[in-house]
Amino acid sequence: MADATEDILRRFDCKASSPIKVPNNLSQSYQMADDSSIDLRDYMDRQKSSRNYSDSEYTPSPIKREKPETKQSAHLSTTTRLPPISPKKLFASPTKNYSQHVMQERSAPNSPQKKSLPNENDDLKNLRLEMKRLKQEYNVKIENLNYKLNLITKERDEIMKENIELTSDKSRLKTQNDLLSVDNDNLLKRKFESEKQLKNSEMKILSLEDKVEKLVSLNKSVTVKNMTMKQSLEGIQVKLKKYYDLYKECQEKHNNPQDSPPKVKIATPDPEVETQNKALQPQLQIQELVQALKNLTIAIESKNDIPSSELHYLVKILKELIAKDIFRPSSPNHQTQPVFQSTPQSKVESVNLENVPPESQPSHVSSNSQQNLSDKSRTSIPSRDNPSPNVLRAEEPQDFHNANPIQSQPKEWTREREERDGSTGYSIRSDMAEIKEFLKFLVDGVKNDQKDTNSPEESNTDGKEEEEKVHIEDKSCHCKPVSNHAAFCPVCLNREDFTVSHFLSQ
């Protein structure tokens, strides 16, 4: 304590000290350097009550001063008495040795003795006050430092909180980063797959473009082929028209020029002539009926005006011929025995077609000329495989190739019109279908009959005669009669690769 006091005294000077900044919340207790608190009031009370009069040089006792008594005046008795103003003593500079200074003070006439110190030196009192002031400054500084420390602690706590929040944000962002990295990996995989698909689609597009190019080239080639086929078709049409004109010219030459207006007249022939023809040529009546049906079919298809009474009459004749069902086999020695046994031997109504114009019968061939045709000229008769479109356009019945189709379907041919369509008038379309179906096997029968009746020798001689005539004559249409009846010339029948039968079949 003495050393500290000496150090303080050495640093002491007479300069005025700076004012002490005391905070507002300053209390009477001060914090010391050794963390011990001192209450100034208690300390001063203890010092007053118990004085230390020991001769210790380390703890000098304070000097007690006695105040001089003052006389009270009469006029100031009622008022408050103020202390006298005494001049302040200047603080003299102390000696270097504190103990010597104390001894000087004690050896002075007014200094206190061992246990009684009536008066205290002003310098010592000032020193104590200075120590007190220094303690106060020290405590104030400590208080300020504590205040600053508290602020710094608060800031540290806030910073710690922010740090904790930042660490939590960091962890959260880390998890988000992990998730985003996973998403990035997935997106990279998808990108790789999409690139693969894009490459595949590009390859497909290239292949499709190649196919398109091939199809375009194929389309061009097909277009060229189509143009060539169209040109060839036009040439064939021109050729067909030429042959059709030639065919029509031949037909006009063979037709009777004295034909009357376009009417199909069906007349009943004389019975005596019919019996003579039947006795001489049994197939002639059937051929005449076939030719009449041909002409009638052509007239219907060319949309000429045909009276319904004549048509009904012809249908009636055909139905009577079928309904009689007279199929008597002829003698084996007879030359004109038919191939099929369904040839009707009943009375057949003949047809007079002399007044039919050439436009209504372009495919007309005389019935008398069909017996004397050669093998080449006989090809003009339509066969079963290639029927004529103007004559044999009806479909074949289901039982057509039976042994006897008429006998297998008697009800189909003999049924009445009321049972067939339930109407009061004739159905021309159904009647014509039946006529065409019946006409189909009639023509085949006549053709087979003619092949059987004509001997091979006669057919060969006829073929040779026709070939000689063809070589002798030019390759132009003469259409001269081959026999007693009118017929087509071989040039018209076999001109280049085109024949009349082929034309009719088309």
Curated annotation (Swiss-Prot):
Note down the stretches annotated as region Disordered: 18-121, 252-276, 329-429, 447-470
The UniProt keywords, alphabetically, are: Cytoplasm, Cytoskeleton
What gene name does this entry carry?
CSA6
Q: What is this protein called?
A: Spindle pole body protein CSA6
Here the segments flagged for biased composition (Polar residues) are 50-59, 94-119, 330-353, 361-389
Q: Does the keyword Disulfide bond apply?
A: no
Q: Provide the function of this protein.
A: Plays a role in mitotic spindle pole body organization, possibly at the point of spindle pole body separation. Required for mitotic exit.
**Where is this chain's protein located in or outside the cell?**
Cytoplasm, Cytoskeleton, Microtubule organizing center, Spindle pole body
Entry GO terms, CC: cytoplasm; mitotic spindle pole body
List where Basic and acidic residues composition bias occurs: 38-48, 63-72, 412-422, 461-470
Extract one GO BP annotation from the record: mitotic spindle pole body organization
Tell me if Cytoplasm is a UniProt keyword of this record: yes
